Amino acid sequence: MAVQQNVKKGGREAGGDLIVGKHVYGNLYGVDEEKLWDEELLKDIVVEAARVANMNLVDIKTWKFTGFHGGVSVIALVLESHISIHTWPDYGYATVDVYTCGANSDPWKAFNYIVLKLKPRYYIVHYADRSSIPGYTESEKR
């Protein structure tokens, strides 16, 4: 059963016709295994990443998957979109995804904060501009 929850307006903003969508995502390699198993630490890192990036936290969920190839997943719903970390401690590997809608939050700050706290040996980061095209309407797709 799905539960609908009302949240305050203002998290997703449009500047005229342009919806500002910024997506920063990447892979972290050589992260300490203990950090990648620590569900509470990862949750705290995501909460603080949302704060430093000027995002409004709505809810956060964590899951731990035990055994070899297990790991931890942390997903934060923010008014602006989401932040997630998925870990594979046996490989010292994590993926990070930060997506925001609106001009007032900065996904780069959240991503960089997570990298700072997890201290990977190296990482690969990608950026996608997910903004709409000014003046483009649904009827023009047809």
From Swiss-Prot:
The active site is at residues 81, 86, 101. Its EC number is 4.1.1.19. Binds 1 pyruvoyl group covalently per subunit. GO terms for molecular function: arginine decarboxylase activity. Is synthesized initially as an inactive proenzyme. Formation of the active enzyme involves a self-maturation process in which the active site pyruvoyl group is generated from an internal serine residue via an autocatalytic post-translational modification. Two non-identical subunits are generated from the proenzyme in this reaction, and the pyruvate is formed at the N-terminus of the alpha chain, which is derived from the carboxyl end of the proenzyme. Heterooctamer of four alpha and four beta chains arranged as a tetramer of alpha/beta heterodimers. Specifically catalyzes the decarboxylation of L-arginine to agmatine. Has no S-adenosylmethionine decarboxylase (AdoMetDC) activity. This is Arginine decarboxylase proenzyme. The lineage of its organism: Archaea, Thermoproteota, Thermoprotei, Desulfurococcales, Pyrodictiaceae.
